[in-house]
């Protein structure tokens, strides 16, 4: 297996971030330049930035699978700054977090809303973090549909099934009764980092790196 220090896969930078800084490293074979996100991926840091889409999920899943192949016994760190997005895309990340051997630590930087909050809560127990001024928001799934009346009924059943499934999973991660999640996700429910800790969505608020 190739050593993690020698791999050359370039991580696609999160979209809409403008100019991406480059980092130049010296080695015995000369200089090598990385975009900053690829360099951080070498440290097993994966960024989930912006809306959760199929494209975002595919990139996050691919990076987690790659890091597992490099070292299946070392933690992966998922940094989340997301307003949420597609339920099915988010669940593909969630299932991969549970499928792979490494523990996945989660850290909220900025915001973790909707599916972002769900994935934040799904990190390995004891390894779910948020920075002091980050925001977390939970709510029920949103959806829209156009079509025949009979199709409306089918889609309504599906979204209700997803709602219950997400509430059951989050209740387990938060250590709370299902009834709490059903009540607290009925409308947009915003929390600061301390409130997210009290609710059970995270395990620790990180004031600085020394607190890890």
From Swiss-Prot:
Q: Name the coiled-coil region(s).
A: none
Matching entries from HAMAP family are given as: ClpP
The catalytic activity, as recorded, is:
Hydrolysis of proteins to small peptides in the presence of ATP and magnesium. alpha-casein is the usual test substrate. In the absence of ATP, only oligopeptides shorter than five residues are hydrolyzed (such as succinyl-Leu-Tyr-|-NHMec, and Leu-Tyr-Leu-|-Tyr-Trp, in which cleavage of the -Tyr-|-Leu- and -Tyr-|-Trp bonds also occurs)
Q: Which NCBIfam families match?
A: clpP, PRK00277.1, PRK12553.1
Q: Name one GO molecular function term.
A: ATP-dependent peptidase activity
Cellular component terms (Gene Ontology)? cytoplasm; endopeptidase Clp complex
Q: Name one GO biological process term.
A: protein quality control for misfolded or incompletely synthesized proteins
> How does the annotation summarize its subunit structure?
Fourteen ClpP subunits assemble into 2 heptameric rings which stack back to back to give a disk-like structure with a central cavity, resembling the structure of eukaryotic proteasomes.
> Which InterPro entries does the record associate with it?
ClpP, ClpP/crotonase-like_dom_sf, ClpP/TepA, ClpP_His_AS, ClpP_Ser_AS
> What is the name of the protein in this document?
ATP-dependent Clp protease proteolytic subunit
List the catalytic residues.
114 (nucleophile), 139
Task: Report the protein's function.
Answer: Cleaves peptides in various proteins in a process that requires ATP hydrolysis. Has a chymotrypsin-like activity. Plays a major role in the degradation of misfolded proteins.
Q: Which CDD domains does its entry note? A: S14_ClpP_2 (cd07017)
**Which family does the similarity line name?**
Belongs to the peptidase S14 family.
